[in-house]
A protein has these predicted regions:
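Acidic, Ser/Pro/Thr-rich low-complexity regulatory regions
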Residues: 1-79
Length: 79
């Protein structure tokens, strides 16, 4: 799955699949994070998830971004 061909009808399962897409995460961590945040808020606005679920998804997105930054720094030898 790439950022360019995302479905407009996301589900929680779609969101979780994109979260676990390590290739997209490491190639474009900022765009990946932004997409996760936007889609989590969209799921909330569409009343697919509740506020507590939104908080959980946002925390997972932030953790994925932190992981990507740490991994990329380690790979570049800057840690």
């Amino acid at each position: 799955m790439t950022i360019g061909n995302l479905s407009k009808a996301w589900t929680v399962e779609t969101w979780m699949l994109f979260l676990r897409d390590q290739s997209a995460l490491l190639q474009h961590p900022g765009a990946h994070h932004k997409t996760l945040l936007l889609q989590a808020h969209e799921l909330y606005r569409a009343q697919v998830i509740e506020r507590d679920d939104l908080c959980d998804l946002l925390e997972l997105a932030d953790s994925a971004l932190a992981y990507a930054v740490e991994t990329l720094l380690e790979e570049s030898g800057n840690v």
